[in-house]
Curated annotation (Swiss-Prot):
Gene3D superfamilies: Single-stranded right-handed beta-helix, Pectin lyase-like
Native organism: Aspergillus fumigatus (strain CBS 144.89 / FGSC A1163 / CEA10) (Neosartorya fumigata)
Record carries keyword Hydrolase: yes
Protein name per its UniProtKB record: Probable exopolygalacturonase B
Gene (name only): pgxB
Function: Specific in hydrolyzing the terminal glycosidic bond of polygalacturonic acid and oligogalacturonates.
Active site: 255, 278
UniProt xrefs under InterPro entries: Glyco_hydro_28 (IPR000743), Pectin_lyas_fold (IPR012334), Pectin_lyase_fold/virulence (IPR011050)
GO biological process: cell wall organization; pectin catabolic process
Domain of life: Eukaryota
Entry annotated with the keyword Ribosomal protein: no
Length: 453
């Protein structure tokens, strides 16, 4: 009898410890309670069992669970997992600083949705000087895993409507829009399986981050208003990043599919699908006066680019008050383009600068050791017969530029035209100067229409 009494007392003590400090609607499942983990939806074949934290979900789009989410993150930190359950919605209406993380998993099977309270978010956010960027939240620390079958929803329609007709790089722009997912001072971050939907601005922005990977992610931005389409909803943007991997991912947005920015090194991309985008881009870099920018050691393979402005693109700023730097050791291999305005383009007259200004104040960003190999498909014909425009600045070095096995055609006619100006050495294929009278008309058309945003 004493044994059973002691056992009952022990069980009572354990239960009291387990619920101590819980907030309403929350619970914690021990890692060894496999039955409870399975019942809650926290059992995952690819991930080991962990102490799992569950928080209450939102009862409506007005039910902000930001405080619950932050509590859940803190409770799951240091070896646990926060589970956002399938079929449930979690509304975030307050900015969140999540830069204290260490060894945490977030299993997103439900929907994590931000409010569209524009006045609140424009007054309460995390601000970055680079291109006047803001975010709802920021994730930092080390060993952070986000996975699942759920949705991270930026709720961007109101932002699209109110930003219509404006430009992100307009120096007078004051309508700042949040980025959907931001890492800052983070190491070893992985995101797998989720959908990222309708970001108000860039979808992902990684700042001072090392070793971040995305696998099997779907990024999508669409508008229900034909006169207010999503703008600047880039798939991936970086700043001071070493080690970015993107694999088996689909991107259906209205801007760059991929766009590493200043001081990004060691990028690996494989099996990427992009629709309606501005290309798998390097840059832009060289924007800020006197600042050295670098992009280096990039491998991009097995990419499909459909119905877009650009395919494989490198872009650098020109003008009287810009920076300098280099894009070096970049390989594009096995790239399939269809109905794409500029299948291959080196753009050293970025952003919003005409040919006369660019000639007067050329770029100081070097493009070196750039390989385009096994590039095939069709242009849109919007740039005439030009399928590749490789034009370098007289102030910069363009060397080691190589094209191999290029099989691109244009519906505007044959033969397709590859333009090369200012490049040092043989590029490996026949190309023509833009001053050639037989190509000048197509080139002028291409450059007059070339996208500048």
């Amino acid at each position: 009898m004493k044994f059973f009494a002691l056992a009952a007392l022990f069980a009572s003590t354990v239960n009291s410890i387990a619920v101590d400090g819980l907030i309403p609607g929350a619970r914690v499942i021990p890692a060894n309670d496999v039955v409870a983990l399975k019942k809650a939806g926290a059992y995952h074949q690819k991930h080991h069992h962990r102490r799992t934290v569950i928080i209450r979900s939102s009862s409506s789009d007005e039910d902000d669970v930001s405080a619950d989410f932050l509590w859940g993150i803190k409770r799951a930190n240091h070896g646990g997992r926060l589970l956002l359950q399938n079929g449930k919605k979690y509304v975030i209406g307050k900015k969140l600083d999540l830069t204290f993380l260490k060894d945490i998993e977030v299993q997103l099977d439900g929907e994590l949705k931000f409010t569209n309270d524009v006045p609140y978010w424009q007054a309460n956010n995390f601000y970055y000087d680079f291109q006047k960027s803001i975010s709802f939240w920021r994730w930092g620390g080390e060993d952070i895993k986000i996975f699942g079958s759920g949705v991270l929803n930026g709720n961007g329609q109101r932002w699209y409507n109110e930003f219509a007709g404006q430009e992100i790089l307009d120096p007078n722009n004051k309508y700042y829009r949040p980025i959907l997912f931001v890492t800052e001072n983070a190491t070893r971050v992985s995101v797998e399986g989720i959908t990222q939907l309708n970001s108000p601005c860039w979808t992902n922005f990684f700042v001072r981050t090392k070793d971040i990977s995305f696998d099997n992610v779907f990024i999508h931005a669409y508008s229900t208003n034909a006169s207010a389409l999503p703008k600047n909803t880039d798939g991936f943007d970086t700043l001071n990043v070493d080690g970015l991997t993107v694999t088996n991912t689909r991107v259906d947005i209205g801007d760059d599919c991929l766009s590493p920015k200043p001081n990004t090194t060691n990028v690996f991309v494989k099996n990427l699908w992009c629709n309606g985008t501005h290309g798998a881009s390097m840059g832009s870099i060289g924007q800020y006066p006197g600042v050295l920018d670098i992009i280096e050691n990039v491998w991009i393979e097995n990419v499909t680019l459909l119905n877009g402005e650009n395919g494989a693109r490198l872009k650098a700023w020109a003008g009287p008050d810009v920076g300098y730097g280099r894009i070096n050791n970049v390989t594009y291999k096995n790239i399939h383009v269809e109905n794409t305005d500029n299948p291959i383009v080196l753009d050293q007259c970025y952003f919003n600068i005409n040919a006369t200004q660019c000639a007067a104040y050329p770029s100081r960003v070097n493009f070196t050791n750039i390989v385009f190999e096994d590039i095939y498909g069709t242009s849109s014909g919007k740039r005439g017969k030009v399928v590749a425009d490789l034009t370098c600045s007289p102030n910069a070095v363009c060397s080691g530029i190589r094209l191999k096995n290029i099989h691109l055609t244009s519906p505007a006619g044959s033969p397709p035209v590859i333009v090369c100006d200012g490049i040092q050495g043989d590029i490996g294929v026949e190309c023509q100067s833009s001053s050639n009278s037989t190509t000048k008309r197509s080139v002028d058309l291409a450059r007059s229409l070339k996208y500048r945003a």
